[in-house]
């Protein structure tokens, strides 16, 4: 066991986690040169294209150190984006140590600090790595200072590397062996294994990625999931070395895969503890937290014929993505669809892109919303994330919305505009903390609903790309949320209703009305488009009618003839306005929902 090292790589987005992992894999001969490609641990096309890691991944590497000893290195790759922090948590629980990667030109950023706190929470040994030293803008000494001041880690242990050129990779491998601790655990104790990930194989069902904490696991063992309370029989187990390599047993300290005839990810809970059914452990591994959906949105197929395809596609996606939830939903305007729960906006974006790409389904997605807690006057409470189920305002006593604690790292010259941006997004308390020279940490409490739309994009724009942002959910607080209905020709359109803070309701309603006025074709009669809270109209635009020249056929003659025809047209238009239906094209919905802004 003393020759095993379980470690993960944690860093801010774009600091070079996946490239460093590639170099470690190459140095240890994890794959042949012919099989190698960039971003080895990123299995989805969308991960490679966007250069982001979405799903945790694992690989077992064999390394012979300079002292001649052979080591087994289990590298657990982790996503860097705040949406997938629950994946990071589970990966950290499976490790004893972590490589803390910092970009030599960018320095310490918000998620570096957030991941540091997470790693310390799980009591991991950290080895700082300064990456991208081949860049012209690299400043290793400055970054060493930041590692010391901002992170409180020993700057002299930090290893300068260039994952791109391969410089310093051997030092990292030696550093892992020397500085990171070996796992502890008793192979003879009752089995305790942590399921930190799972993926679906169409021939073998769900393949579980596990870290054995205590005990030993063998094929044909009957295993019990402690949180899900389900039993399965192990068919096969072994190491993941880009292909599954079967072994006779997995013992305490090892990381490997288990095939146990599990049909879908929904049958088990990721983060669960496995034990033996005939010799169970007393209690599960502590620290288990189910994934929490924070963003909700309705997803409709472009054409109603694709509803069955959408159902199958969501079922297939959720086999691999346990954090995606969905339930049936319908709209008078858009037909049948699903109300889906996501971990954040990037998760929504990734699911949307995968549905369109992998399953070739055109989608209309409603404006994302968070879950509000409503206390009614009769003393009951409701959780509502869909405007359709918003209760009558006269019955509501109070509404609470989720708040987050945002941690923003910026160069000090941008502090004014960033504070203003936070205030625009209804930030409540702001504190500033000076880090190393010229850098500030702004901590702010603000509603999650305000961060959903464009906060991150605006922050990047204001700080010219230097600002970084991370958040943790804190609590629900009372607020003044209203439901705004959009009426076209005095008829409410359910798919366009949204929930918003009263102060921002008019601006957003005006934006919706203007977008619709551009997208809906003109009719023979005047069409009012209104935004209303209850019975009060707060915004309005009008689509002007076509005018047919009914007097064109007259040639000379009396003026009363002309008046008679105009009068007849006026009556016809009044009748049409009363009974005529307005046809709202699909592209009108898409244009409104896509360009949604505050």
Swiss-Prot record:
User: What positions does the domain tr-type G occupy?
Assistant: 2-184
Where does the protein end up? Cell inner membrane
Topology class, membrane: Peripheral membrane protein
| Enzyme class at the top of the EC tree | hydrolase
| Main location (coarse class) | membrane
Catalyses which reaction(s)? GTP + H2O = GDP + phosphate + H(+)
Q: Which residues bind GTP?
A: 14-19, 131-134
What highest taxon heads this organism's lineage? Bacteria
Q: Which InterPro entries match?
A: EF-4, EFG_III/V, EFG_V-like, EFTu-like_2, G_TR_CS, LepA_C_sf, LepA_CTD, LepA_IV
Protein name listed in UniProt: Elongation factor 4 2
Q: Which organism is this protein's natural source?
A: Rhodopirellula baltica (strain DSM 10527 / NCIMB 13988 / SH1)
